[in-house]
């Protein structure tokens, strides 16, 4: 058989064209009446037009050209990202550069204020001769300013003004400036130890602490538990604190109940810090006057038993006083063997606490010094409203004054309802008929009703301008209905039916399931309605632990004492 060549096959009707893209096989579709079109299996591009096929249009970019174009775009994108990252890093460095603990500026080890020799009345002042001598021997870090020396001897010298500051006295720095000194914490890896005063739990809680510290881990420390009444079960207190903290949606590593005075619970905090710091600096943070400096002194004393570095740090420890705003700048303390730093920070000054509205001379009256003993008032302890209205019928129509700072009008209550006040002893409580309450307040303000006290304080006093109506629901007559907490002062426990020896609370009818009161305080002091704090021996009897699911048990922080 003769060998067939390409010429022996019939001629194609039209020349066939292959696509210009490679490398897959080409499928040829034959039809005697139509053109032969070549289509690549791997590409879904539309067929090439006749003009392009015959060379009358611009050639499509080759794969190599497309690759180079993509590479150039990728490189340009990398440059832009690098510039953005560089800008962010620059801003972060600027924020951290504002960190007040500057080694080039020596600060008073008592309050953190920069040392200066020009203004005698300002924080940080030291004698020029002493300053030059200490500077010559490189001992400026061992200096304490004149203000701290006066504070250590009991003088009340405020230095903070502005929103959240304190009226009266000299105001050298604003509360906003002190908050700005803590702004770097959001951009820095640190371990935060947040302090809350148990006597002013709601007022000192710092619910928006994440705005200051970002995502840094937090250890929650409750201070001044030695002020709680005798017989208080710390198991109940710890569970109550954890429950309230979870309701406020604040995630913490653990909760610790402490007393800087008796050192109770401080060793547990020291162990937790050593466990969780992991090379990070440790910052003690909290509202003004919650006891940060006192807690640091107790912490150093506890750590010094095993750590020689902490023992050496005790020589120059922060000053502690009853004046809110004692600390005016972060104080660096070399307290750890690993080289991490411990910082005492300026208190966060809150405008909604009583300390922000009273005169600086009256600030000591707001701080409880001894264990709290509640002052209880029921119908048997109140005066009669008139000779025609015998005592013992109802609490309705009476008004309580808590010093000159709080007024409580009872609008609806049960005859057996009891109000128990927990706060500083310096503020006396007076009960009068509501119809004479306004006249009584105007007459006795500054005399029986203090603070405010003194002529100057009276002139600056703006009165009780904020009023809040509270409707308290009674779910169980055998336990207190609720606490009314006054920010920066204390709280009032409301017991629907006071329990007496040998008697049981009676059953309530449908009309007796609410208590209505009106609380008046100075602007902008806040009033909180919260679950009753289980204090004293009676708290152990009525407090109920909530049953937890497995998931709740897993995420719930542990508490220690």
Curated annotation (Swiss-Prot):
Residues 175-351 form the CP-type G domain. Belongs to the TRAFAC class YlqF/YawG GTPase family. NOA1 subfamily. It is found in: Mitochondrion; Plastid, Chloroplast. It comes from Arabidopsis thaliana. InterPro entries: G_CP_dom, GTP-bd, NOA1, NOA1/YqeH-like_C, P-loop_NTPase. Stimulated by calcium/calmodulin. Inhibited by L-NAME. Not activated by tetrahydrobiopterin (BH4), FAD, FMN, or heme. This is NO-associated protein 1, chloroplastic/mitochondrial. One of its GO terms (molecular function) is GTP binding. It catalyses: 2 L-arginine + 3 NADPH + 4 O2 + H(+) = 2 L-citrulline + 2 nitric oxide + 3 NADP(+) + 4 H2O. Disruption phenotype: Pale seedlings with a delayed development and greening of true leaves resulting in small plants with a characteristic virescent phenotype of pale young leaves but green mature leaves. Loss of NOS activity in mitochondria. Reduced extracellular calmodulin- (ExtCaM-) triggered and salicylic acid (SA)-mediated increase in NO levels and subsequent H(2)O(2)-dependent stomatal closure. Faster dark-induced senescence in leaves. Higher accumulation of hydrogen peroxide, superoxide anion, oxidized lipid, and oxidized protein. Exhibits cGTPase activity; binds and hydrolyzes specifically GTP. May participate in ribosome assembly and stability and thus regulates protein synthesis in chloroplasts. The GTPase activity requires MgCl(2)and the presence of either KCl or (NH(4))(2)SO(4). Involved in the post-transcriptional regulation of the methylerythritol phosphate (MEP) pathway. Involved in chlorophyll-a fluorescence regulation. One of its GO terms (cellular component) is mitochondrion. GO terms for biological process: leaf development; nitric oxide biosynthetic process; plastid organization; regulation of isopentenyl diphosphate biosynthetic process, methylerythritol 4-phosphate pathway; regulation of protein metabolic process; response to oxidative stress; response to ozone; response to salt stress. The gene is NOA1. The keyword Secreted does not apply. The keyword Secreted does not apply. Its EC number is 1.14.13.39.
């Amino acid at each position: 058989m003769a060998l067939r060549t390409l010429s022996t096959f019939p001629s194609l009707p039209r020349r066939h064209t292959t696509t210009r893209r490679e490398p897959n096989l080409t499928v040829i579709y034959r039809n005697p009446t139509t053109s032969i079109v070549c289509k690549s299996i791997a590409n879904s591009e539309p067929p090439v037009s006749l003009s392009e096929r015959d060379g009358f249009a611009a050639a499509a970019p080759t794969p190599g050209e497309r690759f180079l174009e993509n590479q150039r775009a990728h490189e340009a994108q990398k440059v832009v990202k690098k510039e953005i990252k560089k800008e962010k890093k620059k801003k972060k460095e600027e924020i951290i550069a504002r960190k007040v603990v500057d080694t080039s500026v020596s600060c008073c080890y008592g309050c953190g204020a920069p040392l200066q020799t020009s203004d005698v009345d300002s924080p940080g002042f030291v004698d020029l001769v002493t300053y030059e001598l200490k500077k010559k021997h490189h001992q400026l870090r061992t200096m304490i300013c004149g203000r701290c020396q006066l504070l250590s001897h009991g003088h009340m010298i405020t230095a903070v003004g502005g929103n959240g500051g304190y009226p009266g006295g000299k105001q050298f720095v604003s509360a906003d400036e002190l908050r700005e000194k803590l702004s770097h914490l959001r951009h820095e890896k640190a371990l935060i130890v947040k302090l809350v005063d148990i006597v002013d739990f709601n007022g000192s809680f710092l619910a928006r602490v994440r705005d200051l510290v970002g995502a840094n881990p937090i250890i929650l420390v409750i201070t001044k538990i030695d002020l709680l009444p005798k017989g208080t079960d710390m198991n109940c207190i710890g569970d109550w604190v954890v429950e309230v903290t979870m309701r406020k949606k604040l995630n913490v590593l653990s909760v610790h109940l402490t007393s800087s005075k008796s050192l109770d619970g401080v060793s547990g905090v020291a162990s937790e810090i050593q466990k969780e710091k992991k090379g990070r600096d440790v910052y003690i943070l909290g509202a003004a006057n919650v006891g940060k400096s006192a807690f640091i002194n107790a912490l150093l004393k506890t750590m010094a038993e095993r750590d020689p570095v902490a023992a050496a740090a005790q020589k120059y420890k922060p000053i502690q006083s009853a004046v809110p705003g004692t600390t005016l700048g972060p104080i660096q303390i070399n307290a750890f063997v690993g080289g991490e730093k411990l910082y005492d920070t300026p208190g966060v000054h809150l405008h909604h606490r009583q300390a922000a509205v009273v005169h600086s001379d009256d600030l000591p009256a707001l701080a409880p010094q001894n264990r709290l003993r509640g002052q209880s008032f029921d119908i048997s302890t109140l005066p009669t409203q008139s000779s025609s209205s015998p005592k013992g019928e109802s609490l309705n129509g009476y008004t309580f004054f808590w010093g000159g700072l709080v007024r409580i009008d009872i609008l609806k209550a049960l005859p057996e309802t009891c109000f128990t006040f927990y706060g500083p002893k310096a503020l006396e409580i007076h009960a009068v008929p509501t119809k004479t309450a306004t006249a009584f307040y105007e007459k006795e303000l500054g005399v029986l009703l203090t603070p405010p006290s003194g002529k100057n304080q009276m002139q600056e006093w703006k009165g009780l301008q904020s009023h809040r109506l509270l409707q308290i629901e009674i779910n169980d007559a055998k336990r207190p209905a609720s606490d009314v907490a006054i920010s920066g002062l204390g709280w009032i426990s409301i017991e629907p039916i006071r329990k007496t020896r040998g008697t049981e609370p009676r059953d309530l009818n449908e009309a007796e399931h609410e208590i209505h009161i009106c609380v008046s305080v100075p602007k902008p002091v806040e009033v909180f309605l919260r679950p009753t704090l289980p204090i004293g021996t009676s708290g152990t009897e009525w407090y109920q632990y909530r049953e937890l699911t497995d998931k709740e048990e897993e995420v719930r922080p542990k508490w220690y004492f």
